[in-house]
A protein has these predicted regions:
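A glycine/serine/threonine-rich, flexible loop-to-helix segment
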Residues: 15, 39, 51-73, 83, ...
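A conserved structural motif in NAD(P)-dependent oxidoreductases
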Residues: 73-84, 95
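Short C-terminal tail/terminal secondary-structure segment
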Residues: 11, 88-89, 100-115
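Alpha-helical segment proximal to the catalytic Tyr-Lys
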Residues: 35-39, 97
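Short, flexible catalytic-loop segment of classical short-chain dehydrogenase/reductase
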Residues: 10, 27, 44, 48-59, ...
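Active-site helix of classical SDR
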Residues: 22-23, 30
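Hydrophobic structural elements of the Rossmann-like NAD(P)H-binding subdomain
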Residues: 2, 44-47, 57, 101, ...
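Residue(s) in the substrate-gating loop at a strand-loop-helix junction
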Residues: 6
Length: 115
């Protein structure tokens, strides 16, 4: 099982009180399910994308991200949808058979939290 969340699960965003309250609950649920389904060989992980170049990001940055926005991301660019897809493919593969209950950031280094 692979959940798609948001990098804001680790660093809440301003003006998104409801979203900031719900997202950690989804991660807690996923970690619980990972423990419950682990004995059956089922892995459960969550991907936390950062700023990905999608239609949604165009709503956030109608004129495109500014240089300041990009400087906040250590890799200095928006992510691409195929980069999220690559992580999904990895988690769905046998190579990730011992990865469960994890939250994997795919955010170019944007979020600075240690955990």
């Amino acid at each position: 099982m692979i959940n798609i969340e948001s990098s804001t699960v680790k660093e809440p965003a301003d003006n998104l009180a409801l979203s900031n309250a719900v997202r950690p609950g989804v991660v807690g649920w996923a970690k619980t399910i990972a423990r419950e389904l682990g004995p059956e060989g089922v892995t459960v992980n969550t991907i936390a994308p950062g700023r990905i170049d999608t239609e949604r990001i165009k709503e956030v940055y109608p004129d495109g991200p500014t240089d300041e926005d990009l400087r906040a991301i250590p890799l200095r660019r928006l992510g691409r949808p195929d980069e999220i897809a690559s992580v999904v493919c990895f988690l769905a593969s046998d190579a990730a058979s011992y990865v469960t209950g994890s939250v994997i950031q795919v955010d170019g280094g944007l979020i600075r939290s240690l955990l």
